[in-house]
């Protein structure tokens, strides 16, 4: 008898055949429907999200032991993975399919459900185009990885074997040309000048530069790195990478298709929203806290709003105090201020620092910020309290060291540092010491630095790092003070090429340094001014004033000359930079956004009666308009600051982490202002102002903690083409929209259970949160793909599972999951907003968290912000628990009714 599993279809009767066909059709249709179902697609995206996060942590755990590439391959190349629950040594693990299997299943699900089963109508045309682009992208990545052949420098341990690839050409390196920024070892660019010998015969010259590969005979040659030839000292070697991938350009065209499809779809959705929205062009505006039957009584509502106002005011007050710490002036006898003309002239001088020309005011400002944590300090003088600028501090260090050594400009944050260096104790938590106090403990500091350096740079405590930083800042100030001493003891030593050792120069090439004065006379010229100034300190009356005026005249004459060596364009750039730091755009925007937010809250609290005078009834919409215009003004300040930075640096406005903060603040508020024109509820404007204010405050604190000039030029790999600029700007714009949606959802989750908003307002918030999330998805998805294209164009790797890449992918996967669950009707309004809050946490991880993991190409090694980031995670966790409790209580209140 034949097994039931292997029936002979030809011997069955007609009735049996029909029954079997029906069974096969039934189960086949069920399998087909399941393979293309929403549920399976959502589950696969969540699995991809979990795998991406777990794989990132896997790299952190094993990269130091087995290498980054091996750690990546051991997780993302596995057929299945076991993710430990509860820690690395947990006995319970979550089994999941590997990344490759999951991607194949997602491809099949998207092909069946997103192309074959979807209705082919103009309404779904954008979705179809986007799905087609994603399918091409997945196919290009999966097939391209299998078909790619890469030849590069390989370290081969003894006993291992290597595959040999014959290239259809030979290369000869004629010359390798590295270029560095002036005065630094930071590479600006490097190129290999080669001669190519094809198999077909002949030869021709070519150049391979960083970010500018050479394509020939189906192969792509990338400039990877360079080094010193160990066999021939003084000779340079060029490290190239050869890659052969027939599908190299598929991700690029796929990303264009995805962008067109998403923009098309969301434009159609937005158009339908505008057509459905009643009274869009009607006059008047509605602000938060609309009255309706289901809302709280008026008195309780106003008390709750007042409590929220006080809480927000307290948060911003503490933040602004932290951003601008209070001054503790010290009495400095015999202090006489520098003339304003001298300070302005000295601050406008051009110096070479960090590979670029910058004003002395910027140079001194960051040194003071690094030493004291702020850009100015207050001293007590015989004429009263006086605020000293960085330039005045620097001039005092150079020409009046007996005064400068009294200034308490060295900030110490940790008690352990005070005890280790035997410094005098102070009551303040943030202790400030003078140069004279540290000089008395010079031996202890030197001994501590020597012991710390023996430990290496890794695994140092925060106190040890602070001691090293304190010693470096002390050495800088000591070097400035030596200028005056050397000029007095040996004026001839201050020659043309000697002075720049103590004070950076205005020239680019080392040949135009301080060219205004004769070589031998420069030292004597400045020594005379310094000697006159120091003599005047011990005198009184008209004689001292005359000497000071003579000394300042000499200094003015000397300091006025170096800028003549700068070109007109350089002088304009210096003037812009001086204006930029005088403007202090982040602090101005912070104050403006807080003022606009307070105005908006006052509008919500103020509710005139129906029979009130006309002028009182217009106060509320007038206040709302004032808040909108004030927010627009703060956004304009940030936009102007970004434009000024572009003109100074001559690159895109987003080139480092600090610039992303200002860009997110600007774009987040701008997006809220635009949405507010359509919603007219005031809530999205409040969310945008909160986002802008928090971002500005974070930027101020971040700059103070890092104390690094973020306008310094970028390294060679980041001086790229259009793709890099597009990638960074696009994805950061997606960050801004995603964070705006998260802040808006925070407001909803807090206001809805407290009955501060009406039912119609809740529906409007749902639509706004959904629309902003869609906007964020467009830019995060396209920006992530653009980043892969840039990597493929620059060094031949589209995707390498780097933590920064994984963070961007996590954002995209989460937003796609939320939108698809919402489309399926499985996500209530509360869950949509709760998901946006979780999305905000994921954006924070991708934006900041991955920078602190210590692995990957984008690990910046930040340590001072880890505690703040951990506090943010805990704060969001507590808020999520609070939102759940409030929602549960609101549901119980409805059930009781």
What label would you give each PLM region?
Residues 3-897:
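Solvent-exposed, non-transmembrane regions of integral membrane proteins
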